[in-house]
Amino acid sequence: LFCRLRSSRRAAALTALDKVDTPEARAALRAALVQNVAKTKAPAVLRLVFHDSGTRSVADRDGGFNASVRFELSRPESFGLKRGLGPVTAVFEATRDGPASGLSFADVIAAASAYAVELTGGPEITSKLRFGRVDAQGPDPENRMPAESAASTKSAFRAMGYTTRETICLPGAHTIGGKRFGEPYVFDNAYYRTLLARPWDSAKNSSATTDDLEMGSHVGLTSDKNFATDDESLEFINLYAVDQNLWFRQFTEMYVKMTESEATWRDT
């Protein structure tokens, strides 16, 4: 009897999941994304997915991608996230009625951030996403976001289950937004090309003027600049700087992995 009850519950859960991920649900979600996510908000929307997944701990088997970012907005590292949360909330509200009403907030963050990549010229990722996540009901543990040095950043990403290649693949997303890696609304491999050029480094750019170096000093985060002088990181920076398609493919794989990390699913 117990086994039959468990089987019945699992079948019901799977049926509920099937209703979440249908062609009709995906079409309704797509319409809401197009309506509510503007290109000018794409960098802020994409930033959400990194902050939401950046709390993952493989050792503790907690944190990760679960929409807990909604409850973490007062943290110092979350400054400015409300700008991205607005469009995502609008997409979520627009899908509360109709075939996409079963999507969780985490599902919508994953889809909206993927759409932000596509909207700015990057790879199409949304169709590769799995839906049916369960939302967190409170914040994840604090003090898990990466620090500034290359070594500490790689260590933080290892704690989240990522290799060095994967660690270097992800921050290429800084190519959009205000970090000054190329055009702010163009998703390309300018991040890696800029790291190799090191416009902030007078030794690398001996003919640069003081004004040039001053402008260069405002490019990227300290952690980005530290990658540019880390031998292990440079192996992958060089690869992505010359092969944008390779980076697009591997970023897509990493995005899917990141949005499934430590997620709780409705069919489990």
Task: Show which residues each predicted segment covers.
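N-terminal mitochondrial targeting presequence
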Residues: 1-13
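Catalytic cores of secreted/periplasmic or lumenal enzymes
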Residues: 13-268
